[in-house]
Each structure stands twice: as C-alpha cells, then as structure tokens.
C-alpha cells in the first residue's frame, strides 16, 4: 500500500507544473507557501522571504487591494469546483448513471497573477557556502552584509543561466528513470481509470537528452567560510 501511495505521489509531482527551481545548497526559489516565504505585505510594507524591502507606493497599494479581491474570487471558484466534483462522485457511488467528465484545463479556476511589485527577482535566493544572496544583496544568516557590485551581479546572472541548464538536464534524467521504472503515465493512470483499457500496450519513450551532460557550474565566491 505504501508503495502504491508513493508511486501516485511521484506521478502527481512529475505532472505538476514547476513553480520553483531548487538545487540543494545552491539555489532555492521560495514560492510563498505559508509563513514568511515569498512576498508578504503588512502595514503597506513589502517583505520578501522575511526581509524588509520597502513601503508600497499608492499605486501599488491599490494593486494590492485588487489582488486581494481576485484571490478571494479564486478561492470561492475553487471551493465551488470541488463541491461540484464531490457531488458528481457521490451520485456515481450511489449508482446513478452519470458520465464522468474530466474538466478541461481552460475551464478550471485560474490563480490571479502576482502583483507587479512581487517578482521572481525579489524572491529568488542563492545559497552558497557561508552566505545567501537575494535581490543582489549578501546576507550572512539573517543579517544583511553588503550589496553586490556590478561585476558580481553579472557573474551571478551567468551562474544562474548555467545552473538552470544543469537543473533541467537533471530533472529530465529523473523523469526518464521514473518513467522507465514504473512504465510511464499508463502506470499511474491505471490507478485512476481502473485499467479500463485492457489489453492495450504502449511504449514509453525516454526524452532526448544532450550527448554531453552539462556540468554543474561552480558557485561565485561572494563570501569565504572559515573552517
């Protein structure tokens, strides 16, 4: 049973859109999952991952008001969609002949776009040995240390480009290995479709990967840890 649950979770994780780039010990992009991660506004003051950035101007304050309303509407739409799915499931379990309809992606509630004052550049954190960089500022622990100079900013941008290529390669490798191990999407769909298409067979094709695997780039030397 535990294996089945693990397999289903793996399938969901691989199918879900990525909202974070994550490499342990190097880059972590917080996605605003509770607490103080991501962008937080209180008293018209903007924080990113717990660090104070600045006060919102009047235009941004109005943008925040509009965003709050959009979030409330989105939550209500999600709640209604879940209620309809639950009622449909209950009817089918009660023996009523009701065709299962998979909602189209365009019919699903859409999360509102983040305000313009909360960007990926604001919430991206680069973790190096001894320090962390966010918003082109160096922190030691939670203490602000200094600003990056222009050369260091450019160096960080180049590092992020190379690191992104490396991460995408690694993720494709993992997806290919999981697909080969569990038989691809058909393995997971069998749990939810009850194996309705009996006798059918498919071949999982591994994604095409570069012949030469990219190397993980060395991190910039913005701080020195004393061992």
UniProtKB/Swiss-Prot annotation:
Signal peptide, first to last residue: 1-15
Disulfide cross-links: 131-223
InterPro entries (alphabetical): Pepsin-I3, Pepsin-I3_sf, Protease_Inhibitor_I33
Residue ranges the record marks as coiled coil: none
Main location: secreted
GO terms of molecular function: aspartic-type endopeptidase inhibitor activity
Family note: Belongs to the protease inhibitor I33 family.
Protein function: Aspartyl protease inhibitor.
Name of this chain's protein: Aspartyl protease inhibitor
């Amino acid at each position: 049973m535990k294996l089945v649950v693990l397999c289903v979770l793996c399938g969901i994780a691989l199918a879900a859109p990525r909202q974070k780039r994550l490499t342990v010990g190097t880059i972590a992009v917080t996605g605003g999952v509770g607490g103080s991660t991501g962008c937080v506004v209180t008293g018209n003051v903007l924080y990113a991952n717990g660090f104070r950035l600045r006060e919102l101007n009047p235009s941004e304050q109005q943008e925040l008001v509009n965003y709050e309303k959009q979030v409330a509407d989105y939550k209500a739409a999600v709640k209604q969609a879940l209620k309809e799915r639950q009622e449909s499931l209950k009817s089918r379990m009660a023996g009523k002949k009701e065709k299962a309809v998979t909602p189209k992606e365009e019919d699903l509630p859409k999360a509102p776009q983040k305000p313009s004052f909360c960007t990926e550049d604001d919430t991206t954190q680069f973790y190096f040995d001894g320090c962390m960089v966010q918003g082109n500022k160096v922190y030691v622990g939670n203490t602000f240390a200094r600003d990056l100079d222009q050369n260091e900013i450019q160096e960080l941008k180049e590092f992020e480009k190379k690191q992104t290529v490396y991460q995408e390669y690694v993720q494709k490798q993992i997806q290919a290995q999981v697909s080969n191990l569990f038989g691809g999407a058909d393995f997971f769909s069998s749990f939810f479709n009850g194996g309705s298409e009996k006798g059918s067979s498919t071949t999982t094709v591994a994604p095409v990967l570069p012949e030469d695997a990219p190397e993980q780039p060395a991190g910039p030397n913005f701080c020195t840890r004393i061992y």
